[in-house]
């Protein structure tokens, strides 16, 4: 197996598959139907907030990853376990799933990731291996070849996308009159899933993806017509670490191309403003989790006066010092 084998397939999720995923996830107590605060006052605007920040493990990631395990071979899971690559929410979710299921979990993370994240994942029983960022994909591919582990990709897998689509179905259940659905985008798994659910359900809502200016692989992909890496070999520059993979997923991009109306970008300062506005509205969010709200508050969505706008709040996992900086007016050092 090579690193190129880790990319997702070209197939698109169907409505039946999305509904099947939602039904399957309802059988797991740890996959929560998260609250949606409709027409909530945030930063002087009325915004409907889909609080994936209240999902088990603190982010939306558990939806897709739980469904990936549901669809995987049980004997392989028992004998070999799972593997992922992540320094953040995906690694946290896979570590949790290893603990919850008893399957062996291994997480490869960039050598630059903070040690406390490694310790946190290890506390849940995961084996965590730090490698240089440019060698992550090769390390995971070698691990799969040698240990036969099931790959739980952080975003680029159609089963992951189908699982995340359950979030989109819930959004429509709670706001069938939504005019605009706004979703943060890193590799694109959540955006792909929510957009597929919204469009396949027949909703006329406009779906908008939001990326940091310093990590806009999906916007570059939309412009070029194929999944792209960030410039200079995948370099990113943003405080929104959860939205800064070096590349857009191929399976994710195929769904974005089919179901997303527009991808916009926001600055780090705009995400900090949104994080503060959410805090004042009673919602704790990591900076990445505030990106969709940032697009709304910064006027990146066009004329939405009088329209029902639903924004995902994708996660709450943030270090204390990062949160203090986000809530302050002081410039944040990169």
Please report, for each region that a protein language model flagged, where it lies by residue:
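PLP-dependent amino-acid enzyme catalytic core
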Residues: 1-334
């Amino acid at each position: 197996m090579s690193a190129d084998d880790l990319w997702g397939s070209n197939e698109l999720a169907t409505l039946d598959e999305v509904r099947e995923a939602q039904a399957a996830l309802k059988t797991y107590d740890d996959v929560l139907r998260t609250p949606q605060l409709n027409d909530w006052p945030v930063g002087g605007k009325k915004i409907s907030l889909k609080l994936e920040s209240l999902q088990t493990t603190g982010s939306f990631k558990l939806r897709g990853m739980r469904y990936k395990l549901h669809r995987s071979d049980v004997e392989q899971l028992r004998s070999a376990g799972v593997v992922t690559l992540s320094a953040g929410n995906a690694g946290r979710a896979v570590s949790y799933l290893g603990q919850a299921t008893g399957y062996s979990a291994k997480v490869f993370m960039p050598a630059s990731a903070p040690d406390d994240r490694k310790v946190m994942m290890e506390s849940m029983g995961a084996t965590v291996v730090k490698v240089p960022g440019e060698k992550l994909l090769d390390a995971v591919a070698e691990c799969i070849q040698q240990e036969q582990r099931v790959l739980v990709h952080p975003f680029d897998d159609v089963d992951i996308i189908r699982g995340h689509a359950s979030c989109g179905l819930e959004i429509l259940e709670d706001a069938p009159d939504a005019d605009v659905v706004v979703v943060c985008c890193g590799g694109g798994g959540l955006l792909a899933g929510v957009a597929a659910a919204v469009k396949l359900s027949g909703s006329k809502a406009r779906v908008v993806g939001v990326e940091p200016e310093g990590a806009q692989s999906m916007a570059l992909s939309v412009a070029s017509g194929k999944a792209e890496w960030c410039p200079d070999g995948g370099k990113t520059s943003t405080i929104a670490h959860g939205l800064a993979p070096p590349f857009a997923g191929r399976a994710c991009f195929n769904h974005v191309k089919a179901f997303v109306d527009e991808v916009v970008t926001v600055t780090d300062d705009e995400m900090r403003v949104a994080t503060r506005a959410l805090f004042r509205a009673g919602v704790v969010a990591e900076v990445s989790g505030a990106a969709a709200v940032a697009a709304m508050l910064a006027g990146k969505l066009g004329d939405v006066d009088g329209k029902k706008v639903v924004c995902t709040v994708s996660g709450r996992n943030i270090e204390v010092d990062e949160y203090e900086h986000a809530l302050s007016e002081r410039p944040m050092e990169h």
